[in-house]
Amino acid sequence: MPVEKAASKQLVIASGRAHQPLAQEVAEILNTELVPVTAYDFANGETFVRYERSVRGVDAFIIQAHPAPINHWLMEQLLMVDAMKRASAKRITVVAPFFPYARQDKKHKGREPISARLVTDLFKAAGATRIMSVDLHTPQIQGFFDGPVDHLWALPLLADHIAATFGTENLTVVSPDSGRVRVADIWADRLGTPLAIVHKRRDPDRPNQVQVNEIVGGVAGRDCLLVDDMIDTGGTILAAAKALKANGAKR
């Protein structure tokens, strides 16, 4: 069948199936179209992808969201990168707004993998030359990839929206645990508000189990903004919200 040709060095955008409306909106903003991709799953769960036009010499951006089942969508993006490389794209940028396995960025105990590093290695092996992500769980993930990493922050847009919607006079930024203090502090500086911290303990042998110990900072009568980079089961945010209400937070 006939294959469309792509101009050399042309910027092209390809989308995985996890959340195609996101890639479509990006393409519309850039006044371009998505590269047509055929993708489907075999009966045993294997994924197949194929680009339906020439991508030789292009500057490609492969966009994939990573909701559940995350392993499925990660594998699809890896296959898309590999197919793009084998089709002679000049440069391939992986766009992963939520970076898969980002929370597994270090060993908590012996005999554990560093899964975030493995994911960056897989992208490199597949043919990626650059990675773009938003609000990485920890900044050191940028150093895992052997190539440029664009670490984007949603804070400027979100902070302006929060300030315009709720105001800042009665606002307190709250870190739901000690690991998010640095990010919450940046938010507090941006909004010009006080900072509070929820101290918690997490059992390393029981995933998603959270116990709140105490709150550092004044929250009574305040509008509290909880800042976190990832909500999975919602246990951390829910426990923090309950603790804030129990300590007199207004909303």
At which residue positions do the language-model features occur?
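PRPP-associated nucleotide enzymes
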Residues: 1-251
